[in-house]
Amino acid sequence: MPNASRRVLVLTGPTSSGKTSVACAVSQVSDDLVIINADSKQVYRELPILTSQASCGMLYGYLSVFDEFIPSVASWMRDCADCLESVWAQKGIPLIVGGTPMYLYSLLHGINLLPSLPDCLMRELSEELDNLGPSGFLNRFVCKSGEDLSRFSCDSYKMLRDVAYFLYTGKTIQELYRESSVYKIPYDSIDVVAIIPSDRDSLYSKINERFLEAVNSGAIDEVASVVENKAAFRNRAVTTICGFREIASYLRDEITLERMVAMGQRSIRNYAKRQLTWFRNKFNGIKAFDQPQDAERYILREILL
């Protein structure tokens, strides 16, 4: 790799495309490579099987599902910046690996810095959302505030965030974004390599196989240990992990094992579709490969040498 004290290498692609295997392979060839996680679901230490966490690297499993703190793009950017500074200080090569589109988009283009929300406000609103449900929660807020319903997300996690910001600042999330400053990690250069399989059927087959393997390897026990501790579990972001809600429904005897597997697989396939749409529409100029072995070969021969 050419001399660059603050250079970044990124390896991305949809779920089950082979990113982790490529990252592990190239890190074995180059002792200087340090893997940094860029997957928003692989940060929870209680769910390594369900989220297919890598066995090595930074920012994997470093948070707990029982923490009141809910990670965001901004918090990942701060943590990633700290990791990068640490790797650069040791003359290492950071390899950021993951498929969370907003993490990668913010890494490339920067992020709007929004004010931090008080934990007490988030706890209060989260309890209201639990008691009223998404529709009742939003309708109650709209009735009290007189705000336009269409200005708030229908997704429960984003809805909670949007309402919290409005109550705390008196402004909508859109207004805050327009008024905020942009933070960008100060690297010298960045190389982005993506694995974008053209054979969707093959990708979906791998997704199905991986979720089934996770179910058979302990993912059910992982989710059970989380949902059984209802008093401590308040992190809504965890419930958005593909397969989590389906397994939780199975544990409540609401669906059969076979139905749970099918629903979990479908959830992950739909997520992969959204990832592919992001890569197609938002990430111009990246070096994309159809097969993981081609991406590995390019990294080893064109970037690391």
Swiss-Prot record:
Molecular function, one GO term: ATP binding
Stretches the record annotates as Interaction with substrate tRNA: 39-42
Entry annotated with the keyword Magnesium: yes
A matching Pfam family: IPPT
Site (Interaction with substrate tRNA): T100
Transmembrane segments: none
Biological process annotations from GO: tRNA modification
Binding site for substrate: T15, S16, S17, G18, K19, T20
Cofactor field: Mg(2+)
InterPro entries: Dimethylallyltransferase, IPT, P-loop_NTPase
Binding site for ATP: G13, P14, T15, S16, S17, G18, K19, T20
SUPFAM superfamilies in the record: P-loop containing nucleoside triphosphate hydrolases (SSF52540)
Signal peptide interval: none
Domain of life: Bacteria
UniProt KW keywords: ATP-binding, Magnesium, Nucleotide-binding, Transferase, tRNA processing
Family: Belongs to the IPP transferase family.
Binding partners and assembly: Monomer.
Task performed by this protein: Catalyzes the transfer of a dimethylallyl group onto the adenine at position 37 in tRNAs that read codons beginning with uridine, leading to the formation of N6-(dimethylallyl)adenosine (i(6)A).
Full protein name: tRNA dimethylallyltransferase
Organism expressing this protein natively: Neorickettsia sennetsu (strain ATCC VR-367 / Miyayama) (Ehrlichia sennetsu)
